[in-house]
Amino acid sequence: MSDVADRVKKIVVEHLGVEESKVVENASFIDDLGADSLDTVELVMAFEEEFSIEIPDDAAETIQTFGDAVKFISEAS
């Protein structure tokens, strides 16, 4: 797993209180990991802070899964 994926996974586990084993590429933050809309906003903010990037609102709406987050951040970093 890449450094980006490891860091994203750590943020997801800490913010959503889920087991690391449940955070897989196609795991939906809302459907699979129990996040609500506020959680997803907080995740995006945490990703922005951790990786020193800005995620525009329209892009944030497309980040629905762990894999989406890793892909976006990898391309933006």
From Swiss-Prot:
Location(s) in or outside the cell: Cytoplasm
Any GO MF annotation of the entry: acyl carrier activity
Keyword Plastid: no
Domain of life: Bacteria
Pfam families given in the database record: PP-binding
Cysteine disulfide partners in this protein: none
Residues covered by the Carrier domain: 2-77
PROSITE patterns listed in its UniProt record: CARRIER, PHOSPHOPANTETHEINE
This protein's UniProt keywords: Cytoplasm, Fatty acid biosynthesis, Fatty acid metabolism, Lipid biosynthesis, Lipid metabolism, Phosphopantetheine, Phosphoprotein
Record pathway: Lipid metabolism; fatty acid biosynthesis
UniProt keyword Lipid metabolism present: yes
Family the UniProt entry places it in: Belongs to the acyl carrier protein (ACP) family.
Function: Carrier of the growing fatty acid chain in fatty acid biosynthesis.
Protein name: Acyl carrier protein
Organism, scientific name: Dinoroseobacter shibae (strain DSM 16493 / NCIMB 14021 / DFL 12)
Lineage: Bacteria, Pseudomonadati, Pseudomonadota, Alphaproteobacteria, Rhodobacterales
